[in-house]
Amino acid sequence: MSFEHPGDGDSRYYLLKIAHEQFGCAPGELSEEQLQQAERIIGRQKHIEDAVLRCPDAAGVVIPASQIEEAWTQIANRYESAEALQQALDAQGLERVGMRAMLARELKVQAVLDCICAGLPEISDTDVSLYYFNHAEQFKVPARHKARHILVTINEDFPENTREAARTRIEAILKRLRGKPERFAEQAAKHSECPTAMQGGLLGEVVPGTLYPELDACLFQMAQGQLSPVLESPIGFHVLFCESVSTARQLTLEEILPRLRDRLQLRQRKAYQRKWLESLLQQNATLENLAHG
């Protein structure tokens, strides 16, 4: 079977794929602007794929049926049931056979792009070290404070949440906690008006700039095991509890070497593939101009 020249369903397949990947919705839910953007992406993608599949490097590339089946399974797993998948296909006028053909086409394009990178040099330890020391700021881990909070909101429409009542309530909670801070999660579960109450007020490991400025400024001055005073934000009154502190630090080269090597290798591959595609498209354009000249 040849996948170089897809049938009428190819655009519908691409639209389904791009709608989900780029916009997180079904094709029928795209706005007019999004639809136009999707159509431009589809046109460009098909143009590139056609060029790749016609190039000499594609001649010897064969995609095994097992790889196509694996790709199909990954798509099917995105849906709650086989019926939901079939409904999505029906809505786009797609058939399973056509979908598998399009998957095979995509896999072949990717296989060709992988093949052209086969001769690229491996990223060496020296390459990794040079990048690390020239971009040291990328490997700084900010300070993190693991924190919990209790929120009492201000809402003048409710007697128990007027500014005065809310302040009285939060101060009473803080008073109970001052002698027993280990009860913070329990008090948060009972009294906090934030959804985090379900997790005992847990905010998790917080980095600077995450919370309201009023809370942020206080939290990053707190020590482990410390309670904050009553703090006010635009939504109400808070009490914070700092469970642990991780200071800012610089990741060592040894810590990040394997991941950084993979990242640089991928960047090298992407850059090479981009240049190769640009050259291929330029050659095709030149040939087309000569043919029509």
From Swiss-Prot:
<dbReference type="GO" id="GO:0003755">
    <property type="term" value="F:peptidyl-prolyl cis-trans isomerase activity"/>
</dbReference>
<protein>
    <recommendedName>
        <fullName>Putative peptidyl-prolyl cis-trans isomerase NifM</fullName>
        <ecNumber>5.2.1.8</ecNumber>
    </recommendedName>
</protein>
<dbReference type="InterPro" id="IPR046357">
    <property type="entry name" value="PPIase_dom_sf"/>
</dbReference>
<keyword id="KW-0535">Nitrogen fixation</keyword>
<keyword id="KW-0413">Isomerase</keyword>
<comment type="similarity">
    <text>Belongs to the PpiC/parvulin rotamase family.</text>
</comment>
<feature type="domain" description="PpiC">
    <location>
        <begin position="142"/>
        <end position="244"/>
    </location>
</feature>
<dbReference type="GO" id="GO:0009399">
    <property type="term" value="P:nitrogen fixation"/>
</dbReference>
<comment type="function">
    <text>Required for the activation and stabilization of the iron-component (NifH) of nitrogenase. Probable PPIase.</text>
</comment>
<dbReference type="InterPro" id="IPR014282">
    <property type="entry name" value="Nitrogen_fix_NifM"/>
</dbReference>
<dbReference type="InterPro" id="IPR027304">
    <property type="entry name" value="Trigger_fact/SurA_dom_sf"/>
</dbReference>
<dbReference type="InterPro" id="IPR000297">
    <property type="entry name" value="PPIase_PpiC"/>
</dbReference>
<dbReference type="InterPro" id="IPR050245">
    <property type="entry name" value="PrsA_foldase"/>
</dbReference>
<keyword id="KW-0697">Rotamase</keyword>
<dbReference type="InterPro" id="IPR023058">
    <property type="entry name" value="PPIase_PpiC_CS"/>
</dbReference>
<dbReference type="Pfam" id="PF00639">
    <property type="entry name" value="Rotamase"/>
</dbReference>
